[in-house]
Amino acid sequence: AGGDCISDVEVEQEILHLAAEYNVLQFAYDPHGMAHMARRLTDQGLEMMPFRQGTLSMNEPTKLTEKMILQKELQHGGNPVLRWMITNARTIQDNNGCVRIAKENKDSPRKVDGVVAMIMAIGQWMKFDIEDNANKSVYEERGLRV
């Protein structure tokens, strides 16, 4: 499709393709502006898990992600785009000491979306009870890769 917009149908097809290819069990998404797509993906059999972007949802996984990075427990295969986004990311702390990731300036063209997606994935991983899954998780043997 050409033009200035990416088709929702194309995005949905790519999500479903990647979910099948990588055996995605759950898909975390920011519910803001995604209700229709989430419903359609649910109808296609993908388990959609709302994951808000505020400090309440992002605090624990952000702190764990930072710890895992510092302890060299995360591998991203040298992905230059994720590395660039990590350099753009800033931690914002609220009055309660809870943190989330943001850009230095909300109008900045420097992106952090990949970092936020990584933190959301780690947040879902934190919620996922391995013992409830009949299959052994690959993460138990090789660790988490983003």
Describe the predicted segments one by one.
Residues 1-26:
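Nucleic-acid-processing active sites and adjacent nucleic-acid-binding tracks
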Residues 4-5, 30, 99, 145:
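Compositionally biased, intrinsically disordered low-complexity regions
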Residues 7, 11, 33, 57-61:
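Helical mechanochemical/support elements of P-loop NTPase systems and associated helical scaffolds
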Residues 16, 40-133:
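Metal-dependent DNA phosphodiester-chemistry modules and their immediately adjacent helices/loops
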Residues 21-33, 38:
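Short glycine-rich phosphate-binding loop at a beta-alpha junction
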Residues 131-146:
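Acidic, low-complexity intrinsically disordered tails
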